[in-house]
Amino acid sequence: AMDLLKNLLFMKTSPDEYPTLKHRWKDLIDTLGACGEKPLRFLRYFIMAHFELDSKKPLREDDIYDWFTKNSKLAGLEDQPLVFLKTLLECATSWRNFLSAKDVTGAINPYLKNLTLLSGAARQHFILLLAGRHLPQQEFSRLCRAIENLFFCYIITREPTRTFERNFAIWSADLRNAKDETALNQFVKDKFTSDLEKRRAAFDFAFQELKQSRIQQYRMRYILAKLTQYIEQQAWNNSAHDSLDQFIASTVEVEHILPQNPTNLVKEAFDKKERYNEYLEKLGNLTLLEKTINTSVSNDHYQKKVPGYRQSSYLLTRSLAEKPKVGLNTQLNRAVEHLITFDQWNSEAIECRQGMLARLAVFVWDMPGKRKMPDDTTPELINSEWETGDE
């Protein structure tokens, strides 16, 4: 299809402009090649981001050339082939930036970085990134944050990828028309928030049931990193915590509180030893821990591990053993106020912490609907003071 598109461009371009066409085409191929992107996937998502398609008939890679021939005037191929190619090249350059967690200006964007960690080889969200690349930098960053939250909800609730593609392609038309903060807010509310509302129950259930064997390990690390990062942000309100890099570094490990390789004494002491392996991999049994501490706490029982958890710089991990306090009513105190501390580690504790993290996740990924504090097991609503970190 790429060669056919190139031929089509030559057919529509006057001979005196062939040198410009050749130069731009080479730049396009080189740009996609440099970031290892498949040209056909790029073209397919380019079309989805820029043109309205029949939602009942998905655009396949085999259909791309036919689409361009049938829609050559709409795409700009007929009247301004070089302008069309320039737009294509701009999108390829943006695509390369997105893959490097950068916005169209080349600035690092933490939400794009998070999407890179979360998405693996998936690229469906690039449809929306291309459709929104015209937005001012601050608004584009807000769009990226909203995409991250939505994309994660799709992943955790096991939404089929064809749903991502269909939704993102349909929504692109409205996103292309959003030019400022007000329009973007309305777009996010109409498309993202309304979609998330329908998935809220599934999101909560997925977190209550989440365990290592249900999700790829790089995504479990992302989840633990986001939960840990959120508490740090609430406590310190410091831009140093904006990046997930420090939470997913090789110096940080996923710690199993109930140990992976227990001594016989540890396994026998567990209250549901016949279900040890099931509880071992639950989200509630996992936390991030610095490697230097992890080697010292290793496979012992909980009471022996507690001093190690107290040494952690991560408040979510440290709060297993204690709630750090500084002065009276400080931001740090409020950040850890609703985390639960555990005297012993059994099946009930793991289930309790899993529920706590599930309630925390609603804040972390900004899910719409009713919210409860992480330590609140009752159905009452809460105010949002803790969430915003206001004085």
Give the residues covered by each predicted segment.
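Acidic/polar loop patches that form or flank catalytic/metal-binding clefts of enzymes
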Residues: 1-2, 18-19, 295-301
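A cross-family structural signal marking well-folded subdomains
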Residues: 2-228, 324-327, 344-345, 376-390
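Short Fe-S-cluster ligation motifs
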Residues: 116, 317-337
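Secondary-structure transition/capping motifs at alpha-helix termini
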Residues: 135-139, 157, 242-245, 296, ...
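Betabetaalpha-Me/HNH-type nuclease active-site subdomain
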Residues: 185-323, 350-353, 358, 365
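Acidic, carboxylate-rich catalytic segments that either coordinate divalent cations
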Residues: 332-390
